[in-house]
Amino acid sequence: MAQNSVFFPDEFLAQMREALPAHLSFDAFIAACQRPLRRSIRVNTLKISVEDFLALVSPYRWQLTPVPWCAEGFWIEREDEDALPLGSTAEHLSGLFYIQEASSMLPVTALFAEDNQPERVMDVAAAPGSKTTQIAARMGNRGVILANEFSASRVKVLHANISRCGISNVALTHFDGRVFGAALPESFDAILLDAPCSGEGVVRKDPDALKNWSVASNLEIAATQRELIDSAFHALRPGGMLVYSTCTLNRDENESVCLWLKEQYPQAVEFLPLDSLFPSATEAVTPEGFLHVFPQIFDCEGFFVARMRKTAVIEPLPAPKYKVGNFPFAPLKGRETAQIVAAAQKAGLQWDENLRLWQRDKEIWLFPVEVETMIGKVRFSRIGMRLAEVHNKGYRWQHEAVIALANDANTFALTHTEAEEWYRGRDVYPELAPTSDEVVVTYQGFPLGLAKKIGSRLKNSYPRELVRDGRLFTVHDSAN
């Protein structure tokens, strides 16, 4: 296998020699860092079971190796990798899987360990969405996830991934993660803080990741991480679970941050050992019970994961002085709700009691019920999903709602060629037109969007920003 030419600062190498446990070889560490990273995917069980997914892709001759710490995760090798990007396969476009590095599946596995079933979860640094979508799948779209992202440019990507995966229980915010301890004290059953870090573990994906590395920079980052974990711990309810993770390898940003938190709140922080999280987890476990994953252990990116429980109430932070502003939505009730539900069912869309209808001007939205107690405490960028726009002839159903809520009542199956045309933003001309004037078009049994019948043509409503060019779908696809 070809090797990457990785840049290693001398001080970094000295630090790693000291950090490596005695049973791990430094030469093996360097060799692992220089190997290209194995690609991996996670099946989106909100849309398809692992068993059905494996059956669906079996004709493609993909080599799928299970990731030991995530039942939905697989390392993937494909013969047609050069001819067709993994992100252009039909299964990815329709949200059946997420391209996610294997080690980054660890934090969510830890968050839900020992049958933990939280109703209110926060993902403090959520973009691009791999862990938010993994959390949503583990929650079965129930409860609520507050997915926060500080970087404005990454919020759009986060929403696009949430929408593609058919997720309805997310509320998006755009804040510095340090605000939540004061803004939403003791509000969450579980919190994931996948903290911004120096990224020492990603050199297999980015050989130049350490070009700007320095000990001083790491210490500055660690100071920010301490502020973030302190805020997250305040936002966690007593009895709740906090998972802290990074994709870096030094102790300053990992073990030391967690130990600092315990020093601040010795009676309230309980470290929960991760040695039995999955078979062979003991190979990466630290004396404190954390997982410090060096890249040679499981042939993946370097990663760190710690799990802790809040065992007592702690002194609250000062209440925030900012004003959230007026909330522009109003809940819908009674006849209005019944009218929308009936129209949606006719269009082939349905939802359960976890979602409630709200309106802003002519927009109809579905919000997760569990978010309602947070309204007025923080400003949201987006909550739930936009279901429809009201117009004089009824409702114009929105793409994200169709992807998440479509059932089998009003569907029209596209062929392989027609589905490719759909993703290219083109109208479709089926041999036999549907009987309904408006249908949910599907491929492989999964919704692609809403089409309006105009004569023999199905008018494409696929959002322009999602339209794909070039080659689509898998070479070995035997279905038509």
Swiss-Prot record:
List the CDD domains hit by this protein, alphabetically: AdoMet_MTases
- Please name the SUPFAM superfamilies in this protein's record: S-adenosyl-L-methionine-dependent methyltransferases (SSF53335)
Keywords tagged on the record: Cytoplasm, Methyltransferase, RNA-binding, rRNA processing, S-adenosyl-L-methionine, Transferase
Q: A GO molecular-function term, please?
A: RNA binding
Q: Which Gene3D superfamilies match?
A: 3.10.450.720, Vaccinia Virus protein VP39 (3.40.50.150)
Which ranges of the sequence are coiled-coil?
none
Q: Where is the active site?
A: 247 (nucleophile)
**NCBIfam families tied to this protein:** nop2p (TIGR00446), PRK11933.1 (NF008898)
* Ligand binding (S-adenosyl-L-methionine): 125-131, 149, 176, 194
Q: What is this protein called?
A: Ribosomal RNA small subunit methyltransferase F
Q: Where in the cell is it found?
A: Cytoplasm
